[in-house]
Amino acid sequence: MSWLDWIDHGIESQFNPRVAVGDAAESWLNGWVQESLRRKAELGGVFDIAYGTHELMQFDYASGDLALPVIIYINGGYWRALDKSAMMHHMADLAGSGFGVVNVNYPLCPEVTLTEIIACLNDAIAAIVVHVDAKT
């Protein structure tokens, strides 16, 4: 069956986890936010580094062991939900293992298009390279 044959709900459930799993998603995501707030203090990083003019064009950086690679974590909120603040617990786990970690925010749909998100992430990567190079 082609995706073009799906009814609107079927298409929406493929692209929106909140539709696919219902109320369980909110509880799960709220848990992420609470755990992220609790673990942010462990990071000792630099937060909300701007890489553009939009309020969501920011990243966080925890340097870890500068001899190890830097991992860039991009929020996977289906381009339209959440932000980096809900992902701090992932960042803390990686930084706790010695990696440098960058946690990136970007503007969300429908305010911007996917093409604009890609442009923002290109800008973010360029700014991250400059920032990390300055720290090493």
Where in the sequence are the language-model features?
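N-terminal membrane-anchoring alpha-helices
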Residues: 1-13, 17
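N-terminal cap/lid segment of alpha/beta-hydrolase-fold proteins
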Residues: 15-66
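Short beta-strand element of the alpha/beta-hydrolase
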Residues: 68-77
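Short beta-to-alpha linker loops that shape the active-site pocket of alpha/beta-hydrolase fold enzymes
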Residues: 77, 100, 105-109
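Short N-terminal helix/helix-N-cap motif within the alpha/beta-hydrolase-1
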Residues: 81-85, 111-112
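Short amphipathic alpha-helix adjacent to the substrate-entry channel of hydrolases
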Residues: 85-103
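Alpha/beta-hydrolase active-site loop
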Residues: 112-134
